[in-house]
């Protein structure tokens, strides 16, 4: 009986440890996903690049996206 209780407690502890590790390992954000509130979560080959939004010369917001490192994006007219 004591062995069953001990085994149950050990299994419970192992399951809790695995759940805690899974919560800490957040999946990375793929290319073009919004990273405004999570700038460090882009996948390793990407960088969180932010752009300001302006209206009448005043900044009204900011957008951030996971983009390829070293790539320059230009606006097309």
UniProtKB/Swiss-Prot annotation:
Record keywords: Disulfide bond, Secreted, Signal, Toxin
One Pfam family from the record: Toxin_35
Changes after translation: Contains 4 disulfide bonds.
Membrane-spanning residues: none
Domain of life: Eukaryota
Name by which UniProt lists this protein: U8-lycotoxin-Ls1m
UniProt KW Signal keyword: yes
Propiece residue ranges: 21-26
Gene Ontology molecular-function annotations: toxin activity
């Amino acid at each position: 009986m004591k062995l069953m209780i001990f085994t149950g407690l050990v299994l419970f502890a192992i399951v809790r440890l695995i759940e805690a590790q899974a919560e800490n390992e957040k999946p990375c954000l793929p290319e073009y996903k919004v990273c405004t509130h999570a700038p460090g979560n882009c996948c390793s080959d990407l960088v969180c690049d932010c752009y300001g939004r302006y209206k009448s010369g005043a900044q009204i917001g900011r957008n951030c996206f996971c983009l390829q490192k070293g790539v320059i994006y230009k606006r097309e007219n």
